[in-house]
């Protein structure tokens, strides 16, 4: 069973806040053989972050700092983009929406676009009951979806004005 979770992202004022704000998202699933898979997937996550750092460095993009830690019985591998001291607050790149994180806890595996969402899902996993028998289920929180879209309303209007020559009212 795999779950896809998408949530509005709250940004920490101590970190760069991107101009375009994306929702955070995560895949949550169960590992069949956690003793073997945890080590394999942890190495894979670290290797992927390292690979992205090499690519980012070659393209002059910000790089990520890797953090590996235990949170209770869970293991977290996370990465955050290093702040660029020369970047204007209004020009923070879209990459700063992401702090990729992988969580391993018993059989639980969380692959998240942000550390905050990963920690929330880990905390919430302890409150979950047994898995359901549903093949496909969808739950949408419409007010939350509206807030996600509102986060980028002004940016979308400006982009439309520049590309289409529209007025702000259009």
Named regions from a protein language model:
Residues 1-170:
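Signature of soluble extracytoplasmic/periplasmic domains of secreted precursors
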């Amino acid at each position: 069973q795999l779950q896809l979770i998408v949530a509005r992202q709250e940004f920490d004022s101590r970190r760069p806040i991107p101009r375009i704000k994306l929702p955070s998202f995560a895949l949550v699933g169960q590992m069949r053989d956690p003793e073997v898979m945890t080590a394999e997937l942890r190495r894979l996550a670290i290797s992927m972050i390292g690979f992205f750092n090499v690519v980012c460095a070659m393209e002059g993009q910000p790089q990520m700092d890797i953090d590996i830690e235990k949170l209770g019985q869970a293991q977290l591998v996370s990465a955050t983009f290093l702040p660029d001291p020369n970047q204007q607050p209004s020009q923070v790149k879209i990459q700063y929406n992401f702090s990729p994180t992988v969580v391993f806890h018993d059989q639980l595996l969380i692959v998240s676009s942000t550390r905050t969402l990963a920690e929330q899902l880990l905390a919430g996993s302890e409150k979950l009951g047994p898995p359901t028998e549903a093949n496909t289920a969808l739950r949408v929180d419409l007010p939350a979806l509206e807030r996600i879209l509102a986060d980028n309303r002004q940016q979308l209007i400006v982009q439309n004005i520049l590309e289409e020559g529209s007025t702000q009212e259009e």
